[in-house]
Swiss-Prot record:
UniProt binding sites for Zn(2+): 19, 22, 34, 37
Cofactors demanded by this protein: Zn(2+)
InterPro entries per the UniProt record, alphabetical: Ribosomal_eL37 (IPR001569), Ribosomal_eL37/eL43 (IPR011331), Ribosomal_eL37_CS (IPR018267), Ribosomal_zn-bd (IPR011332)
Lineage of the species this protein comes from: Eukaryota, Metazoa, Ecdysozoa, Arthropoda, Hexapoda
PROSITE patterns: RIBOSOMAL_L37E
Gene: RpL37-2
Protein name: Large ribosomal subunit protein L37-2
Domain of life: Eukaryota
Length: 89
């Protein structure tokens, strides 16, 4: 039995499939655990030794639907609803 390149050609079973949380092909089928995000754990997998990877997923890398409007709203006193005040000349 050889142990080098030739034995790699015999591999045809999938160990990982797509993770439903992070979308990467890192979900281990037998372990039922994602090696990328740690699913089904409640907290997302992240370590300090991979600071670059943390930055790729951190706040500010996505759409920021709520946060990108918050600063403008805060400057105006977090007003909501109501009609605009009429200007009197």
């Amino acid at each position: 039995m050889t142990k080098g390149t030739t034995s790699f050609g015999k591999r045809h079973n999938k160990t990982h499939t797509i993770c439903r949380r992070c979308g990467n092909s890192s979900y281990h089928l037998q372990k039922s655990k994602c090696s990328q995000c740690g699913y089904p754990a409640a907290k997302t997998r992240s370590f300090n030794w991979s600071r670059k990877a943390k930055g790729r997923k951190a706040q500010g890398t996505g759409r920021m639907r709520y946060l990108k409007n918050l600063r403008r709203r805060f400057r105006n006193g977090l007003r909501e609803g109501g009609a605009a005040k009429k200007k009197t000349n």
